Amino acid sequence: MYFLSIPFPNINPEIITFGGFSLKWYGVAYVVSILIGWRYILIISKNTSIISKKNIDDLVIWVAIGIILGGRLGYSLFYQPSEHFQNPLKILEIWNGGMSFHGGLLGVIISIIIFSKNKKINILYISDMLA
């Protein structure tokens, strides 16, 4: 039955290392995804006056912060709670890995709510753009 299985690829998580700094595939995926989303939102909102380009730029920053903070806090609370409650400063050690999708999603939702209230833009319009 082994011949029917697909072997799991053994991919090095680091793309390149410079001394103590290493560039990881996971981080590159985050950056590329945010940049593609930013470009997409600029394209679909080009023919509308509901949201300005400056507000879109601000929204992308809010979303990126929501992804990082929410993903890291979600990982800390859902997967390593006892370790992070004993040493809360470990939550800040993002270079050691640990992000959760559902934490990032909650972070984005919270950041969109805050952004829409601050800029007085309908949250349904923003949610529709990001969907």
Please place each PLM-identified region on the residue numbering.
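Hydrophobic, membrane-interfacing alpha helices
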Residues: 1-131
